Design a protein with these regions (language model features):
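Polytopic transmembrane helical bundles with strong interfacial aromatic enrichment
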Residues: 1-128
Length: 128
């Protein structure tokens, strides 16, 4: 599981850099400033959680069950939160109205919060 967690974190990190560069260069010409800021929020949260997954993968004092819970919460959260933000920010560039799926953004955010909460609780339960 450790290799999977760290690999996913690295993939999310690489994609965040690519998407950030794409937003700063290609999308800057076609998106409104407001939509560009929205897109950048998705990139930023993806990168935060890429680093978080790498941290989780490298921690040796977290049991595998806890790591697995955190992994799936963060994986799902990033895909729903950042993914929906990317689609919503670029909505004007496609014929499909992605605002119809806007409700998944807060679900993704909630999953990210749960991932951090599981991490926090596992740390608080540890005996020094």
């Amino acid at each position: 599981m450790t290799k999977k967690i760290i690999s996913t974190g690295a993939i999310f990190g690489v994609l965040a850099i690519i998407l950030g560069a794409f937003g700063a260069h290609a999308l800057k010409k076609v998106l409104t400033p407001e939509h560009l800021v929205t897109f950048e929020t998705g990139v930023r949260y993806q990168m935060y959680h890429a680093l978080f997954l790498i941290l989780i993968g490298t921690l040796t004092d977290l049991d595998e069950k806890t790591k697995k819970k955190i992994y799936y919460l963060i994986l799902s959260g990033v895909l729903l939160f950042s993914g929906s933000i990317y689609l919503l920010a670029t909505n004007d560039l496609t014929p499909f109205d992605f605002r119809t799926i806007g409700f998944i953004t807060p679900i993704g955010g909630f999953l990210l919060i749960l991932g951090w909460a599981v991490f926090l609780l596992s740390i608080l339960k540890k005996k020094s």
